[in-house]
């Protein structure tokens, strides 16, 4: 070898990458963690998130980034609010972040998503931004259609939560007569790929859709 490093029994390897994070949610550790997802979100988390400021997000995100680095993680794919605070926290920590839109019925908008996309893909070498929204059950059809139009405009992938619980899938079937996965495909959200975070309750047909569009 051209170079040898004596690690005294330790391992030298490439850093880990965390592919789905909500870094600023360091505030929610062990908070009502005995509840079903929907109750936890609507009764506990969403009310708290409504009170968070950009300054809060900066400090909460920076705490997470420092912990990631300590754990051997050098980059994350982060879905949350106040990207200006998230981006600054990442740069200040020397951490690589790919931010993702978190649009829903009560926070952010497709217009703001497009603004963020153009701003934070030209912000700093450690920062980039992808199109995204929270989930089918928090985002109405018109918003999803507008995001699909952005995906087509920029030839960009789209990221969201999908099929995390059985009730989420059943409720979507009641609203649209199809699974979240089938709906997202119908709307053209994955014409350029993307991801469906969690995907616990998926059918074989859903998996075929993922394979077709390179969704992971």
Question: Can you describe what each PLM-predicted range is?
Answer:
Residues 1-13:
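Histidine-rich, glycine-flanked metal-binding segment
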Residues 3-5, 17, 98:
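Hydrophobic/aromatic beta-strand patches that form the interior of the parallel beta-sheet core
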Residues 7-8, 60-61, 79, 134, ...:
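Fold-independent oxyanion-binding glycine-rich loops
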Residues 14-26, 157-166:
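Histidine-centered catalytic micro-motifs
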Residues 29-94, 114-123:
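Alpha-helical scaffold segments that flank or form the walls of functional sites
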Residues 47-50, 133, 192, 214-216:
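Short, basic, glycine/proline-bearing loop/turn elements
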Residues 85-203:
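Metal-coordinating catalytic core of metallo-dependent amide/deamination hydrolases
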Residues 202-205, 210-216:
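A conserved active-site cap/scaffold subdomain adjacent to cofactor or substrate pockets
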């Amino acid at each position: 070898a051209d170079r040898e490093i004596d690690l005294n029994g330790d391992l030298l390897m490439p850093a880990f990458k965390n592919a789905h994070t909500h870094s600023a949610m360091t505030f929610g550790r062990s908070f009502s963690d005995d509840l079903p997802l929907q109750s936890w979100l609507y009764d506990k988390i969403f009310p708290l998130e409504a009170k968070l400021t950009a300054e809060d997000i900066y400090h909460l995100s920076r705490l997470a980034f420092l912990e990631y680095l300590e754990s051997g993680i050098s980059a994350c794919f982060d879905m949350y609010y106040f990207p200006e605070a998230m981006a600054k926290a990442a740069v200040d920590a020397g951490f690589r972040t790919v931010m993702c839109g978190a649009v829903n019925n009560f926070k952010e908008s497709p217009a703001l998503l497009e603004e963020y996309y153009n701003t934070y893909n030209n912000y700093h070498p450690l920062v980039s931004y992808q199109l995204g929204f929270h989930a089918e059950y928090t985002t109405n059809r018109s918003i999803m259609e507008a995001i699909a139009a952005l995906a087509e405009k920029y030839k960009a992938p789209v990221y969201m939560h999908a099929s995390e619980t059985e009730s989420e899938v059943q409720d979507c079937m009641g609203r649209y007569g199809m699974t979240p996965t089938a709906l997202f495909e119908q709307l053209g959200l994955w014409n350029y790929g993307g991801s469906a975070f969690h995907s616990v309750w998926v059918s074989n047909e859903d998996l075929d859709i993922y394979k077709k569009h390179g969704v992971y």
